[in-house]
Amino acid sequence: MDNTSKVHKLMELAELARLPRRKEVEGAVIVIKVGGHAMVDPAARSSIIKDIVTLRELGALPVIVHGGGPEIDAMVKRMGMTPSFVAGIRVTDDETLEIVRMVLVGNVSPDIVSLIMRHGGKGVGLLGSSGSLLIARKKPMEKVKVDGKEIMVDYGWVGDTEQVNTSILMDLLDKGYIPVISPIGYDRDGHCLNLNADTVAGDIASALKAGSLVSLTDVNGVMMDPSDKSTLLSHLTEKECEDLIERGIISRGMIPKIRSSLCVLKAGAHSVHIINGNIEHALLLELLTEKGVGTRLTLK
């Protein structure tokens, strides 16, 4: 970074320091789930990571959990397979698990870490086996309602987080790093499991007693009508979320996102935010201004 760039950066930080909620992020752990769809566009991806590095420079302690849905789907199709989902969860057989590992650990995570470095931060990629970060258990078969009918579903090599080793994350945060976590866990017998990135972000936020959880997606937030941006719901309580799920307004992949968000709030987080990562500086606007740009969830 040359001297001119450094001066511009200092001026930018000074402006951000005057925003209404700047003090709320200082010293706070902020878990940021970056969705695969929000990271497809290279310019948006770079902007998101730049804002995360800026939060670190403002005194926040960001932790990134990334997905990779579009990239995984593309590779699955390239291998002549068809992506399979039930209730927003990817059904993961042996071949799909190998693709998930290859894409997340080999492509998505290194790309995010390199962008952090490019914007002046220090990133480090992690997965469940890194210092036993994510101990998981295989998801059992369960009854799921599909098209009005209950069916038994075997998700394959899909897991739920059982334990989060927070010490490795806190050590990295204390040393100035931004952890970048791939949602791949291991059970106590060493079997690899595909984890839902939204759920992992929630589990990590709960374990770290994070101040906020932010989910960056390719939608503006929770909307009464997904095709009409004017129906964005800027604030929702737990009761309102449950009602919208029951009515089918919150559906598909948004359900695990909301469920994990509510668990994070019950664990002590002040707020959870669902925002569109394709909006320029959405992360900073949501966390540092009163109005925000997406949907803010609170218990009451």
UniProtKB/Swiss-Prot annotation:
Transition state stabilizer (site feature) positions: 33, 257
Keywords, alphabetical: Amino-acid biosynthesis, Arginine biosynthesis, ATP-binding, Cytoplasm, Kinase, Nucleotide-binding, Transferase
GO cellular component: cytoplasm
Compartment(s) of residence: Cytoplasm
Pfam families, per the entry: AA_kinase
Catalysis performed (reactions): N-acetyl-L-glutamate + ATP = N-acetyl-L-glutamyl 5-phosphate + ADP
Molecular function as annotated in GO: acetylglutamate kinase activity; ATP binding
Its EC number(s): 2.7.2.8
Residue intervals passing through the bilayer: none
Entries under CDD domains matching the protein: AAK_NAGK-C
BP terms from Gene Ontology: arginine biosynthetic process via ornithine; L-arginine biosynthetic process
Pathway: Amino-acid biosynthesis; L-arginine biosynthesis; N(2)-acetyl-L-ornithine from L-glutamate: step 2/4
Residues that bind substrate: 68-69, 90, 194
Domain of life: Archaea
Family assignment from sequence similarity: Belongs to the acetylglutamate kinase family. ArgB subfamily.
Role according to the record: Catalyzes the ATP-dependent phosphorylation of N-acetyl-L-glutamate.
HAMAP family: ArgB (MF_00082)
Record PANTHER family: N-ACETYLGLUTAMATE SYNTHASE, N-ACETYLGLUTAMATE SYNTHASE, MITOCHONDRIAL
Protein's recorded name: Acetylglutamate kinase
